[in-house]
From Swiss-Prot:
The chain crosses the membrane at residues 4-24, 31-51, 59-79, 88-108. The keyword Transmembrane applies. GO terms for cellular component: plasma membrane. Keywords: Cell inner membrane, Cell membrane, Membrane, Transmembrane, Transmembrane helix. The keyword Cell membrane applies. It is a multi-pass membrane protein. This is UPF0060 membrane protein OCAR_5428/OCA5_c25530. Belongs to the UPF0060 family. It is found in: Cell inner membrane.
Length: 110
């Protein structure tokens, strides 16, 4: 699995898992929503371990850009809120930051 696939899968699992809690606490859905929500959050954590990075902190920092962009897509697809130009600009800045973290030149040891 590539790092990008792991990041995207992790984002879907984290957003879906967190949305289960949102649905329960904010939308009045059944607490049974927590069962798939917790499973999704566990899968999210597992998927981040598949990222090609020797450092957890670096993997998590890079993941942040994917998470932000994915959350905006989720809001559009699942909640009907189309991202505005500021959402898109902010996500673009985050994705550029993610690329710097992942692909910036550094010594081979780290």
């Amino acid at each position: 699995m590539t790092s990008l696939a792991a990041f995207v899968g992790a984002a879907l699992m984290e957003i879906g898992g967190c949305f289960a809690f949102w649905a329960w606490l904010r939308l009045g859905q059944s607490p049974l929503w927590l069962i798939p929500g917790m499973a999704a959050l566990a899968l999210f954590a597992y998927l981040l371990t598949l990222v090609d990075s020797p450092l957890a902190g670096r993997a998590y920092a890079a993941y942040g850009g994917i998470y932000i962009a994915s959350a905006l897509v989720w809001g559009w697809a699942m909640e009907g809120h189309r991202p505005d130009r500021w959402d898109v600009a902010g996500a673009t800045i985050c994705l550029i930051g993610m690329a710097v973290i992942l692909f910036g030149p550094r010594p081979a040891a780290l």
